[in-house]
């Protein structure tokens, strides 16, 4: 039964903000249990809302989910609680901001053993910008290693709440969950009653169903949506019929009407999930709203990588798999490309490194496609001498040096939260990665928040792994894109016997090009198998070779059959062998094994 007019004041829309592993999905399970949306014996798996295998395995939430719960408070009133689950990872911050826009309140969940982490702060700022009521919650208070008082001080310093406003819970054991439910009802504001206004509904997520097409999850901000209405999407001006609308409580419940304040879903035979864009506004054709809801933007991919099938005859399988994946993931962008070394494949754009890993893992796991990935890189802006601007996301597309005026690369602002004893290590890593140090804030006596600005190209690679290893796993990071800046960048080519291998070329800063070239040549020397002739591995910038390694030839002893005898006989055989090797070198192609392309990814090891 959808809420009627009198019940708009009984609706509470809220989300949970937390760093990875701070217990967000477990807390959501407890809320479902307390409200009897699900009984504990029905929970075949923990983390009910994380329904992808990958989400459960990595312990992260990738897609936003929504679930409606009914709760009878201690004041005897029946409330409708809409929990909108948000992805917690930096790559998905736009999805987070749209999920937050669908809420009036947020639970800020902090692990009692870990304290405030970087992504908690980043998402908290998004929530404050969205004007949400924030309820701080300390989770995992039952663990022996928990420091509840210390974490409470961090939260007070961060958002300036009173100590008694901070709730203490253990999501796993259900301690304090009843108090939390009462706090949600008491502190989260009810939605505004805008039913008289023209319809405006915010899409905060969309999923693809093989039978129904794209299903949009929506929050009705203004007006009323009825089943059978003709609706228009602002982003692409397309018109659809609302075939089915309803609310979500782990499964879809069809209703006839959704009013301002409600959260639900909309099915209208949309063939492509790209037509139901996250952040878009839906209005009625008959009585349209004058303008869309604020905050919509087209999400641009930040990291690019080539995906190639291991077996060249699997190209069509890869195409089909990418098509199916992109139905569910509107932020995945891909175009076909060819490489002389790897054959046919796709150039894919991702929101960030985690997004890239997830796509690769899902391709291999859900679709059984074995793929090779090239070095991830970012999109550079090349200002030509003619004055035009070219965007380059693949080193092999870089124009000739003589035609380039200058090159710009994307920068990000990053905050790193860590224990104070690791500051030195992190500063060193920051300087190695061309970071600009900004400032340091102390969160408490032992934890600091360090601000840097980095070129995105230095961060997309293995920065997160390095950060974790130098801080023994204690550092967490979060970054946001701040724009393009001019840099002294060069294209580094790898030549095998004078032939460039396009899949191994990369764009690096001039100051690092010699070291990178040398390391790459040494790495390849250990991977490329020996041939019957000498192989020269060279790293070059333009026509200038800056590093070289040689793989010596395998040699057959042609003198074995000459026991004694004349030196000229031996010389003749050696000359003949030399001649043959020279001819082989001219016609032979060096086979580059697949490990060589992966070597670039772990060049420092």
UniProtKB/Swiss-Prot annotation:
It catalyses: GTP + H2O = GDP + phosphate + H(+). Coiled coil: none annotated. It is found in: Cell inner membrane. InterPro entries: EF-4 (IPR006297), EFG_III/V (IPR035647), EFG_V-like (IPR000640), EFTu-like_2 (IPR004161), LepA_C_sf (IPR038363), LepA_CTD (IPR013842), LepA_IV (IPR035654), P-loop_NTPase (IPR027417). It comes from the Bacteria. One of its GO terms (cellular component) is plasma membrane. Residues 9-192 form the tr-type G domain. Its main location: membrane. Keywords: Cell inner membrane, Cell membrane, GTP-binding, Hydrolase, Membrane, Nucleotide-binding, Protein biosynthesis. GO terms for biological process: positive regulation of translation. It is an enzyme of class 3 (hydrolase). GTP binds at residues 21-26, 139-142. CDD domains: EF4_II, EF4_III, LepA, lepA_C. Pfam families: EFG_C, GTP_EFTU, GTP_EFTU_D2, LepA_C. GO terms for molecular function: GTP binding; GTPase activity; ribosome binding; translation elongation factor activity. NCBIfam families: lepA, small_GTP. Required for accurate and efficient protein synthesis under certain stress conditions. May act as a fidelity factor of the translation reaction, by catalyzing a one-codon backward translocation of tRNAs on improperly translocated ribosomes. Back-translocation proceeds from a post-translocation (POST) complex to a pre-translocation (PRE) complex, thus giving elongation factor G a second chance to translocate the tRNAs correctly. Binds to ribosomes in a GTP-dependent manner. This is Elongation factor 4. The lineage of its organism: Bacteria, Pseudomonadati, Chlorobiota, Chlorobiia, Chlorobiales.
